A protein has these predicted regions:
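Catalytic machinery of carbohydrate-active enzymes
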Residues: 1-268
């Protein structure tokens, strides 16, 4: 049985807060012990963490391509149920995609420990936490062994406490598109000078242009025929190339109930 969204949020709060408090001094001590061996190099093996949002896994693509253009090998950690979204644009090599199975608490714990081992095996040196509110990803960021850890921080504002395990803290800007906020995280990862806070840059609309998904022509043709058949069964006039199709997703799942259509808005 899959873990519900509400259960995840409850666990993230009641378990995440004490774990962040425990992990914070441990991460600080490890940073202190490894400081004499630190090398001031640019990110070589860069991991993005975005577990629960399939849409964000697509919107972060321009940021990932920017990291690649800067010479980094990119990796991605995501929930197993959302991993298919990364295959649409194929920016991340399949062997560089790490997954966590959230279908049960035991699988979640096992895959988490397995990831922490893998992160060290692959010698991940930089990690970017794309999440805004998750303490779980904050813990993964702090404990994965990366020396350079980038993510959003509340600074002097009020909000969710996720510990202080980031080495490069970025201010989230709610007035710009999330894709631009992702670009600011990559800028912070590669910045040669410290900023407080990161990232004081201007990001153009051209920098967040999304690549087009490559779709198998046979699959596309099959779907077109299926849509025409369904339209014919419903006695709706439709022919590919003659009428347009509008896709609407009225159910945004339990992650964002605010995006759902109200039940009274549906037609019988």
């Amino acid at each position: 049985m899959a873990i519900s969204v509400n259960a995840m949020r409850t666990i993230d709060h009641w378990v995440g807060v004490p774990l962040c408090a425990i992990a914070r001094p441990i991460v600080a001590l490890l940073d202190l012990l490894s400081k004499p061996f630190a090398r001031s190099t640019e990110p070589k093996r860069l991991l993005f963490i975005e577990l629960s949002e399939m849409g964000s896994a697509i919107l972060v693509d321009p940021a990932m391509r920017k990291a690649q253009a800067n010479g980094a090998d990119i990796y991605f950690l995501i929930f197993k149920s959302n991993a298919a979204s990364l295959g649409l644009l194929n920016t991340v090599h399949p062997n560089h995609i790490f997954t966590i199975d959230s279908s049960s608490l035991w699988k979640l714990a096992f895959d988490t420990l397995r990831f922490l081992v893998k992160a060290r095996f692959y010698r991940i040196d930089t990690v970017i936490d794309l999440e805004l509110f998750s303490r779980f990803t904050a813990l993964l960021t702090g404990l994965c062994g990366a020396r350079r850890r980038v993510g959003y921080h509340i600074f002097h504002g009020e909000g969710l406490w996720r510990g202080t395990m980031l080495t490069r803290k970025v201010h989230y800007n709610p007035h710009i598109h999330i894709a631009k906020n992702f670009i600011s995280l990559v800028h912070a990862a590669f910045a040669k000078e410290e900023e407080q806070p990161f990232s004081k840059i201007t990001i153009s609309d051209q920098e967040i242009q999304l690549a087009h998904a490559v779709i198998d022509p046979m699959v596309k043709q099959y779907l077109q025929l299926r849509i025409e058949n369904l339209a014919q069964q419903a006695m709706i006039p439709f022919k590919h190339g003659q009428q347009r199709i509008i896709l609407i997703n009225p159910n945004a799942s339990d992650l964002l109930p605010q995006r759902r259509w109200a039940p009274e808005r549906f037609s019988e």
